[in-house]
């Protein structure tokens, strides 16, 4: 299977080869890895549980384990910062199973080459058929070969947020007792009877 969406560049693929076994041994899955250079070099790792719901403590554990392996392998020549995070609500879609898991939700998909005169597609995911990602666009449902994709991510919508909150609550990962109470009283400039 093509994993260019998980690790695009050659150095990213090398990082994935090194860190995937570590992450999988811990019970997690690699969603994406990127080595980004600029003023500073950052190795960004996105991981998740197979059923979703990675926590901050999980990210810290992954960071420690991956850091130890990278110290031994030493694949990055420059100093770098290691960032481990969840994929987030508007997560990248990097594996065929992601397109099945989020069927019905809105996504943006880009292809490496032109398909029917365009490279960008936005619409509701309609599942997977063999090695094709199905997406409902204005013109109808189309199939894009997974290997054609250069980028794909969920679009942040109210429905997606509600579903993620529902899943976290169902998994017991959302404790509403720690939320602040929100006051919905409206202040007005009209003086009350006692102010006159």
From Swiss-Prot:
CDD domains named in the record: YlxS_C (cd01734)
Chain spans, region Disordered: 176-196
Chief location: cytoplasm
Bias (Acidic residues) ranges: 177-196
Stored InterPro entries: Ribosome_maturation_RimP, RimP_C, RimP_C_sf, RimP_N, RimP_N_sf
Alphabetical keyword list: Cytoplasm, Ribosome biogenesis
Any one of the GO CC terms: cytosol
Pfam families from the UniProt entry: DUF150_C (PF17384), RimP_N (PF02576)
Cytoplasm found in the keyword field: yes
Disulfide bonds, paired cysteine numbers: none
KW Cytoplasm (keyword) present: yes
BP-aspect Gene Ontology terms: ribosomal small subunit assembly; translation
Compartment list: Cytoplasm
Family matches, as NCBIfam families: PRK00092.2-5
Family under the similarity heading: Belongs to the RimP family.
Function: Required for maturation of 30S ribosomal subunits.
Entry-linked PANTHER family: RIBOSOME MATURATION FACTOR RIMP (PTHR33867:SF1)
Protein's UniProt name: Ribosome maturation factor RimP
